[in-house]
Amino acid sequence: MIKKWGDKLTISFTPLHGAGGDLGSKALKEAGFNKILTVKEQFKPDGPFPTVKYPNPEFHEVFKISESYGADVELAVDPDSDRMGVGYRTKDGSYNYLTGNQIAALMVNYILTAQQK
């Protein structure tokens, strides 16, 4: 899947002012994604989290800035990078956001499918 979409998908990534910026960007690049837009307004660690009320990637409000980047997929991690939020652009240009359970199900599906090959 990454080989097919790595050069096509545009991904915005935000660590929400936390510690995961460099590692998250590097992980996406090493996985094979080539169109990564880091959300510069939220990239640098900053404890007061000036651009969000709560730096929780499960709250759709944290994607307000990254939506302006116009990416196909939005990824956000919380400040200590142990939770992830995902949004994707729909045909009408709006974004849908996945729940934690949906993200986990997709990851398990990907892992099991990859093991069969």
Which sequence ranges carry the predicted segments?
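Phosphate-binding chemistry for phosphorylated carbohydrates and sugar-nucleotides
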Residues: 1-117
